[in-house]
Amino acid sequence: MGRKLLGLLMLAVLLAGCAGVPSSSAPQAIGTVERPAPSNLPKPTPGMDPEVLLREFLKATADPANRHLAARQFLTQSASNAWDDAGSALLIDHVVFVETRAAERVSATMRADILGSLSDMGVFETAEGVLPDPGPIELVKTSGGWRIDRLPNGVFLDWQQFQATYKRNTLYFADPTGKTVVPDPRYVAVPDHDQLATELVSKLIAGPRPEMAHTVRNLLAPPLRLRGPVTRADGGKSGIGRGYGGARIDLEKLSTTDPHSRQLVAAQIIWTLARADIRGPYVINADGAPLDDRFRDGWTTSDVAATDPGVADGAGAGLHALVNGSLVSLDGQHTVVVPGAFGRMGDQTGAALSRNGRQVASVVTLHRGAPDMAASLWIGDLGAEAVQSADGHSLSRPTWSLDDVVWVVVDGNNVLRAIQEPASGQPARLPVDSVAVATRFPGPITDLQLSRDSTRAAMVIGGQVILASVEQTQAGQYALTYPRRLGFGLGNSVVSLSWRTGDDIVVTRTDSSHPVSYVNLDGVNSDAPPHGVQMPVTTVVANPSTAYVAGPQGVLQYSPSADGQQGWSEVPGLTVPGAAPVLPG
């Protein structure tokens, strides 16, 4: 019964358009860690009505500790013995119970909407759909009141209680090049702040979510382990990461000896803890000695600033734009046509600066919208000449990887990497395996943008946001894997997208009530204010501080301000119809 039900539920999530979250054998998986129960969880009482008891049971499943001990208080002993609570939890809302009552027994069926899933690693993903009938739930009257005597296997978690109990934290793993760290958001139910650091470091050791297993490096992988719980820098057990107390992390069985790898060990730990508001200094020891003698008294975030996941790429390059088909830069409130090929060429329809801001990739489209439309990709140094690197009937807006390679979609379905051959210096086009994307989400890819760390690709397919992992195969080729949909609330309205941070994407839409929205890696979407934006909006580019969109009146910018005055404003010099913003990325 249990395995059949689990298969049915995962099928429901897949049909709804959200990949099921694989379970994990992580040693610190949710539900196995011994910790106090959150204080806001309900408990059964003798006079509790059967329906009330069922609803309170769904709330109690929010605490995974000790194999959902809080929820098991609502079960008879035989039901508790039989209940399999392993694997992913389904997050449900708008729950309705249909009951058949007798004096000593109640049988109920449950109807609900599925809003997402939560894996035993703490990975949350949004979903949508109706919960298939999980089978009957039976209650019996005992000396202590009503108790559940039969229930389906698996965990059904009340959405409101999930939001009240779990907190989103982000783990960080090293990108394949070792230049930066990559976010892996997790949800944890740790009511005691002093236990949070231990929980997060334990999750780092357990490893990334399955879709990231082949896209990142984990310098904290086993056999490395924690020697004991994370403490204050002076060894104290309370006030960890608060005030000037700092945090002390004692590791053992660390095999890496080279300084750069040890720096990445520190970076993974420090950014994970710092982003969880667990403050340094961070005293990190390995096998009884400092991880690095230079930092025996503790590391700070400035010591790993080179890997800062929040740094804006090529910030010094500033905003550029395509105006009347040519690339321009901003000089105060005036535009200046850039020297070289990209300033001379007309009919440019999409462009991007490289991550360091020193190179340009641009698409020239002739006879746009006509049957004989032709597009070509040009790459070169900013201010210099360019080389034609790809062509087709249509080309998507280009995007740069962390290793300065340009990605583009040719004719809607063929994803290419445009490189320069080391020996000849000539351009070469290398195909990217996108079969997994095309199989799951058929249709032309109208926009593709790589994340800053280049381990993820966000795409627009059929007006939907599709996220995929970027994997490098053993043969050195690249593939887009684990595709899943983000932002069900966006419908099919998405036009263009851009990574604001490694965890947050900005999109333009055809919805005049919400012309610009955000969606994160979990799939949760929210809206930017609409006032000041005229329709239609097209190209969007963003960095951590500002989003820029192309509209009928030219380029608009949006920067949330500290005083709460949030709105869109025109970019001086770019109030030209058809102007499109360009940033590194």
UniProtKB/Swiss-Prot annotation:
Instruction: Give the positions of lipid attachment, kind N-palmitoyl cysteine.
Output: 18
What is one Pfam family matched by this protein? Answer: Germane
Q: Where is the signal peptide?
A: 1-17
Where the protein is mainly located, per its record? Answer: membrane
Q: Which InterPro entries does UniProt cross-reference here?
A: GerMN, Lipoprotein_LpqB, Lipoprotein_LpqB_C
**Keyword tags:** Cell membrane, Lipoprotein, Membrane, Palmitate, Signal
In which compartments does the protein localize? Cell membrane
The protein's topology relative to the membrane is:
Lipid-anchor
Q: Where is this region: Disordered?
A: 24-46, 560-585
Q: Can you list the disulfide-bonded cysteine pairs?
A: none
Q: Name one GO cellular component term.
A: plasma membrane
Asked if the Swiss-Prot or TrEMBL record annotates the protein with the keyword Magnesium, the reply is no
Q: Which family does it belong to?
A: Belongs to the LpqB lipoprotein family.
Q: What is this protein called?
A: Lipoprotein LpqB
